[in-house]
């Protein structure tokens, strides 16, 4: 039970950080403006993403909300069943849950997701903190599952 409470608190803290950064961006940067943050590495901007990754499937908020809920509920169920498994499995699922819920909050409350990070050194989609949680969480989860498969667990 203690481990579940710790994971829940971590999820809430991660969501809080995501929402805090999004709120700061909305208040400090006009829509569409780009500001250098770490020169030649990362710029900050304010983008209202009404689609999915890379802004695909624009204005399908209900679809994304339903998909997000299904994924988050599935991740919570899987986490519940595998709470005593490896630290990495738990960490990956925790990040996926926090990232999914962070973007879900935006979709439901605003009808779009606030994106802000622009990588200056590569042509890549503008993304947010929750997207980072999701990406890192999926990578960690895949590595943990691959490791379990190799070890025969």
Curated annotation (Swiss-Prot):
The gene is lspA. Pathway: Protein modification; lipoprotein biosynthesis (signal peptide cleavage). PROSITE patterns: SPASE_II. One of its GO terms (molecular function) is endopeptidase activity. It catalyses: Release of signal peptides from bacterial membrane prolipoproteins. Hydrolyzes -Xaa-Yaa-Zaa-|-(S,diacylglyceryl)Cys-, in which Xaa is hydrophobic (preferably Leu), and Yaa (Ala or Ser) and Zaa (Gly or Ala) have small, neutral side chains. Its EC number is 3.4.23.36. It comes from the Bacteria. This protein specifically catalyzes the removal of signal peptides from prolipoproteins. One of its GO terms (biological process) is proteolysis. One of its GO terms (cellular component) is plasma membrane. It is an enzyme of class 3 (hydrolase). It is a multi-pass membrane protein. The chain crosses the membrane at residues 6-26, 60-80, 85-105, 124-144. Belongs to the peptidase A8 family. HAMAP family: LspA. This is Lipoprotein signal peptidase. The active site is at 115, 131. It comes from Streptococcus pneumoniae (strain ATCC BAA-255 / R6). It holds the Pfam family Peptidase_A8. Keywords: Aspartyl protease, Cell membrane, Hydrolase, Membrane, Protease, Transmembrane, Transmembrane helix. It is found in: Cell membrane.
């Amino acid at each position: 039970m203690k481990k579940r409470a710790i994971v829940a608190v971590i999820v809430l803290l991660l969501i809080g950080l995501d929402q805090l950064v999004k709120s700061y961006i909305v208040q400090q940067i006009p829509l569409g403006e780009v500001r250098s943050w770490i020169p030649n590495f990362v710029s900050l901007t304010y983008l209202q993403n009404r689609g999915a990754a890379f802004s695909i499937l624009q204005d399908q908020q209900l679809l994304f909300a339903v998909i997000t809920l299904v994924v988050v509920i599935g991740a919570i169920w899987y986490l519940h069943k595998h709470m005593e498994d490896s630290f990495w499995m738990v960490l990956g699922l925790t990040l996926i849950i926090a990232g999914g819920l962070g973007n879900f909050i935006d979709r439901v409350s605003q009808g779009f997701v606030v994106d802000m990070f622009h990588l200056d050194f590569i042509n890549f989609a503008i993304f947010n903190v929750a997207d980072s949680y999701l990406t890192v969480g999926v990578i960690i989860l895949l590595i943990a599952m691959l490791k379990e498969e190799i070890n025969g667990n």
